[in-house]
Each structure stands twice: as structure tokens, then as C-alpha cells.
Design a protein with these regions (language model features):
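Metal-dependent phosphodiesterase/phospholipase catalytic core, i.e.
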Residues: 1-118, 122-137, 146-182
């Protein structure tokens, strides 16, 4: 929290905060008592770290003369409702920052929510895109809902592609596919 304590409950939606309010949060370590924290017990704590803007990340890399490739994952979901901006606004802002920094040729934009990937490819075909999928008991972006489609796949109908996930990825226009599965 801005006062230096772990959030005891879900915090405010990020989109409701000003940049100054967002930067008040110390994000330099994960709470080790949470399930997420227990997944990463070796995480190096960096107390006092603030959330950088995308432009600040690009500037940080540029200041070091680096030619790092950027693998940017959009953290937006089809189940977020109005707690996040709409996918088109999200992608337009991200693409504008990528282009302003002159790093489109070394950026991959990836997401489990293919809406952002499809929009990115339409708006900025020069940016490499990656469709992500997950098939886990507690997180499945492949399993269809009652409509026969997964809300994660930008409205794509698997039946129109032989119920083949690789064909669905290709039809979405993704340059890459990263599949995650397990138990």
C-alpha cells in the first residue's frame, strides 16, 4: 500500500489511480505469506521500487546502450469487466509507446487475451505478436464456454478451424504461439 504495508484486501482498480497514486505503491517484493509469494521464495527483494511506465522501461534500457528485445505481455483479460480499459485503448497506448521509443523491431506483444494481440497486429503489423494459451485446472484459456468458444480467443470459433488450436492461432494472425499446460 502507499503507507508501506501489504494490501489486506484487493486494492483499487489500477485504472482508477493517477500515475502519482500508482507510483506511491512499493512493489519491490512479493508478500512471502501469500500463495504467489510461496511460488517465488528466492525472489530478490528491492524495497522502494515503484511501478515504471513503459516509456521509463524503454528509457532505462536505452540509457545503458542495450539492444534488449522486449517481450511485453498485456495484462488484460476478457473477464476483467470495467476494472481495466478496453482492449483497443490499451493496445493503441502500448503501440504508441513502443513506436515512440523506436523499439517496434525488437518487441513482441503477447497475451492470453487474444483481443489485444489481434488488435496489435491490425494497428501495428511490424510488431511481432504471440498468442498465449494455458490449460490448467484453475486457469484454462482453451476450454470453450457455453457458446462453444473460449472468451480468451478473440471470438474465434474452433470448429471453423477443425478444432485445431494451432490452426486457430494461425487464423488469429499470431506470429508465435506459447502453450502452457499441466496439472
Amino acid at each position: 500500500s502507499p503507507s508501506g504495508f501489504w494490501l489486506g484486501a484487493r486494492g483499487p482498480a489500477i485504472r482508477t489511480l493517477t500515475l502519482a497514486e500508482l507510483k506511491a505503491y512499493d512493489v519491490g517484493r512479493v508478500n512471502p505469506s501469500t500463495s504467489y509469494g510461496k511460488q517465488w521464495p528466492m525472489q530478490l527483494a528491492r524495497d522502494g521500487e515503484r511501478i515504471p511506465t513503459l516509456a521509463e522501461v524503454f528509457g532505462f534500457v536505452r540509457a545503458r546502450g542495450s539492444s534488449v528485445r522486449f517481450n511485453l505481455e498485456t495484462k488484460i483479460t476478457p473477464t476483467s469487466g470495467d476494472s481495466v480499459v478496453d482492449p483497443e485503448t490499451f493496445v493503441k497506448v502500448a503501440v504508441a509507446e513502443i513506436r515512440a521509443a523506436g523499439v517496434a523491431d525488437r518487441t513482441t506483444l503477447q497475451s492470453f487475451d487474444w483481443r489485444t494481440v489481434v488488435l496489435s497486429k491490425r494497428i501495428a503489423p511490424e510488431i511481432v505478436t504471440a498468442c498465449l494459451t494455458a490449460e490448467f485446472p484453475n486457469f484454462d484459456t482453451v476450454k470453450p464456454d457455453g457458446s462453444g468458444r473460449s472468451p480468451w480467443q478473440a471470438g474465434r470459433d474452433p470448429a471453423r478451424h477443425g478444432n485445431s488450436l494451432p490452426r486457430l492461432v494461425k487464423a488469429a494472425g499470431c506470429d508465435q504461439w506459447s502453450a502452457n499446460a499441466g496439472s
